[in-house]
Amino acid sequence: LLAAALVAQAHGAEPVAPGSAAATWLEKVRLAAEGLEWSDDAVKHEWRLQQRPGSDAWRILDPADACVTTGDEAACRAEFARLEAAGQIPPVTGDAVIVLHGLGENRASMQPLVKHLRSRLDATVLTFGYASPRANIDDHGAALGRVVASLPQATRISFVGHSLGNLVVRRWMHLAPAPDLTRVHRMVMLGAPNQGSDLARMAARVWVLAALSHGAAKDLVLNWPEISRSLAVPACEFGIVAGGKGDGRGYSTLLEGDDDAVVRVAETKLDGARDFLLVPVSHAAMMKNSSVQEATVSFLETGRFGGAAAPAPDAPPDE
């Protein structure tokens, strides 16, 4: 769609007026496309040092998501450090919460939840963007580790993940040095495929879909048995929010049992969870759901979701 709009302009179409609805839409499309291409390497408030995975293309984004510097890794790291030393990029101190999106999404998909968290928590709420189609879960976990390492003055760090974002956090936890892990406070998992994904297993049986899988999607579709062994169970307090109807059937006719249209309730299970909550919401709508938003705040503050929490499923799904 973005390409079509640009081609139309190049062939004499009426230019898009700045600030118009069309310009706003084009900007959203551009940011969505870039979210599939660039991964954060350092995040300080809304300043970002980013890399295009698999290349030596680096850049710095300011709080308006405008690109202020491009170049190789050394040049961009040096400029980011200069901006920090000059006080343009302030340090993150005290409590921090890092929010992660899911597969094929970008930071914008988490904004409804992020906005709510920022209005309610006495913490710096950051978003971690990663190019899910361009790199595997190992690479995304390593990138998250560099983001955490870039926050040395954050005394406690909590995580909120949606879908694949939870697996990225768990992969980082498997790799993380002890000093970083000691700063981890709590984690909220939203629609997490902790036991893999039946939808991914279905895709693996269709050779065309399997062949088209790239990056983190390939890990879910083809490499799950291996990947699952490299994901840590969080040592911190963590709670799980699952979407479902509570009727044993769920939103999808393709999936067995209750589900959120993408992830089965049973697939969200992970031993050691401090609390579990079933919410009547689809996978893609979790971030906008007021019950999910309030439960997330409650867990980050108290270690419990509050209200009536459903019992966790007794067993993970069959492989």
Residue locations for each model-derived region?
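Sec-dependent N-terminal signal peptides
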Residues: 1-3
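Serine-dependent carboxylesterase/thioesterase catalytic core
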Residues: 97-103, 118, 123-235
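Residues that form or flank phosphate/diphosphate-binding pockets in enzymes
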Residues: 108, 135, 287
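Short amphipathic alpha-helical segments
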Residues: 110-112, 171-173, 201-202, 252-254
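C-terminal catalytic-base region of ester-bond hydrolases, centering on the histidine
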Residues: 19-23, 233-319
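Flexible, membrane-associating and regulatory peripheral segments of lipid-active enzymes
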Residues: 6-97, 106-111, 115-126, 148-150, ...
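Short catalytic/ligand-binding loop motif for oxyanion handling, primarily in non-cytosolic enzymes
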Residues: 106, 196-198, 247-250
